[in-house]
Amino acid sequence: MSKLISKQGKRPALSQSGLAKPSTSKKSSASKNANTETAKLLTKALHPRNVHKYGYDFAALSKTLPALTPFVGPNAYGNISIDFANPDAVKQLNAALLLHHYSIRDWDIPHGYLCPPIPGRVDYLHYLADLLSAPHKGKANRNIRALDIGTGANGIYPLLGIESYSWQFVASDIDKVSLDNVDEILAKNPQLAAKLSLRLQLNPKAIFNGVIEKDEYFDVSLCNPPFHRSLADANAGTQRKLSNLAKNRGQSQQQAVQAKVALNFGGQKAELWCEGGEAAFLANMISESKGFAAQCLWFTSLVSKSENLKPCYAQLAKQGTSEVKTIEMHQGNKITRILAWSYLSLSQRQAWAKLRDQSR
C-alpha cells in the first residue's frame, strides 16, 4: 500500500468563531428550519461540467485505447456502442474514458470487483464542488480535502476528483485487496500518488471511527453505500440489470436470466451489500458523523432508495445538524440523490472556507 500520505488537514485556531463547537441547540431557528425544510436541488441531466453529457465518442476512445476497438460495433438499433453486459467491454470502456478525459493510465480492477459507470461517478464530484461553493467555470478550489468512504478496488472518486479538481483525498476501505489495487493504479500514475492516502478500516462495522484521525479536518466526505441487504438480494438486482440490458439488445428474457451473474455488475460483499442494507448503513454513518461534527465541513452520501431519506432527515434533526441538503441527479431514467449535512452554522462554514483558503 502506498506510504505517500497527503498533507493532513489542519484547521487554524478559531477562538472567536466557535468553529470547534458547532451549534447543536434544538432551539436554534436556523437548525430547525434546515432540518424541517430540506433544501432540494433538481437537475434533469448530467451536470453541465460533465464531459460525458453528450455521450461516448467511441471513435476517439478507440484511438486513445486500441484495446477497446474489438468491443465496439453497431447495437440492435444500429448505433455504435459496446455490449454493456460484457464485463471485458465495460472495463475497456472505463480504461479508455479515464485515459482519454482524465489522463489516468492503465486503470484496472481485479476479477469480480465493481466496475463503476464513469459519468455518474464524476457527476457526484461536480455537485460536491458546487456544494463547496466552487466556481461554475474553470477549475474549482484546489484546496479542498475530501474523504472517500469505501473507495473500492476501482478508487474512482479520488482518481476523478484529483484529475478534475486537484483535490486532496483520503480513501478508506475494509478490503485490503481493494486498497492494494488502488495502490497499483497510483504506481502507474505518479501524478496522483501525492494527493491520495489509502487507509484500511479494521472495523467492518465502523465508518468514520478508525479512519479520521485526531486534529484532522476534511471539507467533505463522500460515499456510495452498499445497496442490498444480502447476497441473494444483490444477485437478484444483478439479474434485473442483465435482463434490462438483454431487452435493449433484443434478447429474450430467458437468455438474460441464464446470463452469468456479476462481473461488470458484480462486486464483493462490502461493495454491494451489508446487514440492513442502505438504510442501516446510512443510519450508522449519520450516527458516527456526530462525533466528528467539527472535523468535517460537509458529510455526504449517495442515497439510491428515496424511502430511505425520511428516516435520515429525522435522525439528522435529532442530532442537531445546522444544514441538510438533498441533491437529485438525473442520469437517464435513473435518479440518484446526494444527501449532505453539516453541523456548522452558515457563519462557521464561511469562516471555515476563508481560513482554508488562507492556510493551505
From Swiss-Prot:
One of its GO terms (cellular component) is cytoplasm. Gene3D superfamilies: Vaccinia Virus protein VP39 (3.40.50.150). InterPro entries: METTL16/RlmF, rRNA_lsu_MeTfrase_F, SAM-dependent_MTases_sf. Keywords: Cytoplasm, Methyltransferase, rRNA processing, S-adenosyl-L-methionine, Transferase. Its EC number is 2.1.1.181. Its main location: cytoplasm. Residues 1-36 are annotated as: Disordered. CDD domains: AdoMet_MTases. Pfam families: Methyltransf_10 (PF05971). It catalyses: adenosine(1618) in 23S rRNA + S-adenosyl-L-methionine = N(6)-methyladenosine(1618) in 23S rRNA + S-adenosyl-L-homocysteine + H(+). It is found in: Cytoplasm. GO terms for molecular function: 23S rRNA (adenine(1618)-N(6))-methyltransferase activity. Residues 23-36 have a biased composition (Low complexity). One of its GO terms (biological process) is rRNA base methylation. PANTHER family: RNA N6-ADENOSINE-METHYLTRANSFERASE METTL16 (PTHR13393:SF0), SAM-DEPENDENT METHYLTRANSFERASE (PTHR13393). Belongs to the methyltransferase superfamily. METTL16/RlmF family. Specifically methylates the adenine in position 1618 of 23S rRNA. This is Ribosomal RNA large subunit methyltransferase F. The gene is rlmF.
